[in-house]
């Protein structure tokens, strides 16, 4: 599958990740062009890749990457928009829409941070949980994986992320009374399906923390807690969704005395 017409994109905060370096070298051996999105300037991947885009997030002091993850997402958005432009796949209207969505992100995330006390309160209720499960569909599932990873990395709580569409195929058997479920509900055309998933886990005794775009107040009837996100284009919504998940993990870890 990999030849001289293949572009391999490598994403690494440190630029020293052993398996990513091995994949890069194998791709280059097969003739592929390699493009790295890296935070650490002058790192191995940055030096050896054919092209590199630095995210300039600054050093990550903690084990878990947070700001670098957010800048990596932004780099991917920009690259995708640029490539779509080059392939003449974006109308001027769509291009303007996506650029505006990116420009709004800093303000939207600032608004989220103003409400971090709410996330801290939720964390204070469930920082001693044995397991926390994350559910999402399509883009939300990708963010669920990141949220679950962060919680595991810094709080040492057992956590897994599952595609909500597969809930009935084994996953739901893990839900019992008091299990904490974080349900990501920001994909507009799948919102009703996520509501259905929330009802299913609630019926088995789960405590549900939902993350949804502001305006979807009907979710309050089903979830125990709702974290609302400022409205934004669905394309860049993962950049907003990940912030409360990072904060939740941080507060849980801090309350457990692991900071």
Describe each PLM feature range:
Residues 179-187, 241-246:
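Hydrophobic membrane-spanning alpha-helices of multi-pass integral membrane proteins
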Residues 1-104, 184-230, 248, 256:
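Glycine-rich phosphate-binding loops that contact phosphosugars or nucleotide phosphates
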Residues 51-180, 256-259:
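Active-site phosphate/pyrophosphate-binding segments
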Residues 1, 18-21, 121-122, 142-146, ...:
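Extended hydrophobic-aromatic, low-complexity segments
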Residues 224, 235-259:
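C-terminal functional extensions of proteins
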């Amino acid at each position: 599958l990999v030849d001289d017409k293949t572009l391999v994109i490598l994403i690494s905060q440190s630029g020293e990740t052993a398996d990513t370096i091995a994949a890069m070298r194998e791709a280059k051996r097969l003739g592929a062009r390699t493009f790295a999105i890296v935070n650490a300037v002058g790192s191995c991947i940055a030096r050896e890749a054919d092209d590199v885009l630095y995210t300039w997030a600054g050093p990550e002091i903690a084990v878990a990457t947070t700001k670098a993850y957010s800048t990596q997402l932004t780099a991917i958005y920009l690259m995708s928009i640029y490539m779509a432009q080059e392939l003449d796949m974006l109308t001027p209207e769509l291009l303007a829409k996506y650029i505006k969505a990116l420009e709004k992100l800093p303000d939207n995330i600032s608004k989220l941070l103003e409400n971090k006390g709410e996330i801290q309160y939720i964390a204070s209720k469930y920082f001693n949980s044995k397991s926390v499960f994350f559910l999402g569909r399509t883009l939300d599932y990708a963010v669920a994986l990141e949220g679950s990873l962060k919680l595991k990395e810094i709080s040492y709580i057992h956590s897994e992320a599952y595609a909500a569409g597969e809930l009935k195929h084994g996953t739901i058997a893990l839900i019992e009374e008091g299990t904490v479920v974080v349900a990501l509900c920001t994909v507009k055309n799948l919102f009703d399906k996520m509501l259905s998933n929330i009802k299913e886990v609630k019926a088995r005794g789960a405590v549900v923390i939902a993350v949804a775009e502001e305006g979807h107040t009907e979710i309050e009837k089903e979830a125990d807690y709702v974290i609302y996100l400022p409205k934004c284009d669905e394309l860049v919504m993962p950049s907003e969704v990940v912030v409360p998940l990072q904060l939740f993990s941080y507060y849980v870890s801090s309350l457990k005395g692991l900071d």
